[in-house]
A protein has these predicted regions:
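Serine-hydrolase catalytic machinery in alpha/beta-hydrolase-like enzymes
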Residues: 6-97
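Conserved alpha/beta-hydrolase "acid-adjacent" motif
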Residues: 39, 158-165
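A conserved short beta-strand
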Residues: 122-134
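Acidic catalytic loop of the alpha/beta-hydrolase fold
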Residues: 135, 156-161, 184-185
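Short beta-strand/loop motif that positions the catalytic acidic residue
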Residues: 146-147, 152-154, 158
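Conserved loop-alpha-helix segment in the C-terminal half of the alpha/beta-hydrolase fold
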Residues: 162-174
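Catalytic histidine-centered segment of alpha/beta-hydrolase-like enzymes
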Residues: 182-198
Length: 214
């Protein structure tokens, strides 16, 4: 699953991304978590699944220090979008893509919920939110009021999990997948290896259903 490593220079900043191309007219932009990068199981297999279904993939390689999350959510969103927007624009400007979708984990759900879901040009894009940061009101409200199709996955042992919120989100167009006994990394229990592998397999299976339906 080797892609082309590319970079964009903006002022004195370099923003790197990897573009994995299979000659498709659809693309999935992926946004990693703070410590959960594209080599980790969920991203690895989600990337493989996209390529299997003839969807090109873009991994955006941002990194932020721990102090960013101490700032107001509007600031966090702007900092992230300042890195993400130029790459989305660069990838889409060729006109090769008719369809786009967005997949983020944890930190990577911030740009999806607080920006991309609200943009008219992406109103038909599927949104995939893995362990979203639902304790932030802006993220929860945005997902609740969005009309997007897609998928939301969260473990019921995740510190971001709230049963009342999930019940409300059931009214959205997103398919909701709750992983029993799973934490923020979607690990099941403390060291339950087989159950954790099964949980990831189930998430990828559900993602396949979402990706396949037009």
């Amino acid at each position: 699953m080797k892609g082309t490593k590319k970079e964009i220079h903006i002022d004195d900043k370099v923003i790197r991304y990897t573009h994995i191309e299979k000659g498709s007219s659809a693309v999935c932009f992926m946004f990693s978590g703070s410590g959960y990068n594209y080599d980790k199981p969920l991203f690895y297999y989600a990337t493989m699944l996209m390529l299997e279904h003839k969807i090109n993939v873009v991994h955006i390689h941002y990194s932020y220090d721990g102090q960013l999350m101490e700032k107001p959510m509007e600031v966090v969103t702007k900092v992230m979008m300042d890195d993400i927007n130029p790459i989305i624009n660069e990838v889409l400007k060729s006109g090769q893509y008719n369809d786009s979708m967005f997949l983020g984990k944890s930190l990577g759900t911030i740009p999806i919920a607080n920006d991309l879901m609200k943009r008219e040009e992406f109103s038909q894009s599927k949104m995939i939110l893995l362990t979203p940061l639902l304790t932030f009101n802006s993220i929860f409200d945005s997902i609740l009021h969005s009309r997007h199709e897609g998928l939301l996955v969260i473990g019921d042992r995740d510190h971001q999990y709230n049963a009342d919120q999930i019940e409300q989100l059931d009214h959205s167009n997103l398919k909701i997948e709750i992983v029993n006994n799973a934490n923020h990394s979607l690990h099941v229990g403390e060291y339950e290896t087989e159950n954790s592998i099964e949980a990831i397999a189930k998430v990828i299976e559900t993602l396949k259903e979402v990706v396949r339906t037009n």
